UniProtKB/Swiss-Prot annotation:
SMART domains: MeTrc. Interacts with the C-terminal pentapeptide GWEEF of the methyl-accepting chemotaxis protein McpB. It comes from Pseudomonas aeruginosa (strain ATCC 15692 / DSM 22644 / CIP 104116 / JCM 14847 / LMG 12228 / 1C / PRS 101 / PAO1). Pfam families: CheR, CheR_N. Keywords: Methyltransferase, S-adenosyl-L-methionine, Transferase. This is Chemotaxis protein methyltransferase 2. It is an enzyme of class 2 (transferase). The keyword Amino-acid biosynthesis does not apply.
Length: 280
């Protein structure tokens, strides 16, 4: 009896790509990161991973999975290729006045501020946090510690450099651009770099949120974990939220993304603003 071969997900592709290939990618990514890829992401997966196949000169996704199993270092590159890195300076702008108010209150108590940006991507979020604190506290040497982490080592390298195309700064007020960025010239024309004083306020680390040890000390004043939870299933969301809330001070703030809500976790957090929560 003849056996049928899996049909490609899309026609006329450079690499043969089946539903089985996509399901295997979904399973591997979930196992490594806890991220649940939606069925609608099949084309995105092909686009991202086909670059790896070309670079490695592999002929099929089956060959790539074999390579993935044989080369431990490829797992991180696999994760880097598939994790989404959509970000912007002062994204979800309504969060930053609340952070500034929190900073001023803590300064009055003579208490240093500790903040974790848990999905830092290419750095726009932690640098927006740093700018907010410098502006609120009136000093380039504020009593703050900002830890910024991501699972993707590639974006963290970009974040540490702090170099961005000028168009990324288009929506930023001119005084902030002038104070916190250096405009490139010559071969760096069309780019801007975060000033060194601001870069020194942020410590970048590679952290997989599914790891048992985050190496993040407690008593945090704020955690930014925005537009991350949507990639996890509800049980994983609850486990992560429980761990993060345990790191916050009682008056600390948890900043979530615009498409996230934690109605299912009201025993852990209470809403104190638009997508802003405190420990319950």
């Amino acid at each position: 009896m003849p056996t049928s071969t899996p049909s490609p997900v899309f026609g006329n592709q450079e690499f043969h790509y089946t539903r089985e290939d996509f399901q295997q990618v979904r399973e591997r990514l979930y196992r490594l990161t806890g991220i649940s890829l939606a069925e609608s992401k099949a084309q995105l997966v092909y686009s991202r991973l086909s670059r790896r196949l070309r670079l490695l000169r592999l002929g099929s996704f089956a060959e790539y999975f074999t390579h993935l199993d044989r080369e431990p270092g490829e797992q991180q590159l696999f994760v880097n290729a598939l994790t989404t890195n959509l970000t912007a300076f002062f994204r979800e702008r309504h969060h930053f006045p609340l952070l500034a108010d929190l900073a001023r209150r803590q300064l009055q108590r003579h208490r240093p501020l500790r903040i974790w940006s848990a999905a830092a991507s290419t750095g726009e979020e932690p640098y927006s946090i740093a700018i907010t604190l410098v502006e609120a506290l009136g000093s380039f040497d504020p009593p703050v510690k900002i830890v910024a982490s991501d699972i993707d080592t590639g974006v963290l390298d970009c974040a540490r450099q702090g170099v961005y195309p000028l168009e990324r700064l288009e929506q930023m007020p001119a005084p902030l651009k002038k104070r916190f960025f250096l405009r490139g010239t010559g071969p760096n024309a069309g780019k801007a770099r975060v000033v060194e004083e601001l870069r020194q306020l942020v410590e970048f680390r590679q952290i997989n949120l599914l790891e048992a040890d985050w190496s993040i000390a407690g008593e945090l004043d704020a955690i930014f974990c925005r537009n991350v939870m949507i990639y996890f299933d509800k049980p994983t969301q609850t486990r992560l939220l429980e761990r993060m809330v345990a790191l916050l001070r009682p008056e600390g703030l948890f900043f979530a993304g615009h498409s996230e809500n934690f109605v299912h976790a009201s025993h852990l957090v209470r809403s104190v603003g638009q997508t802003v929560y405190s420990p319950a």
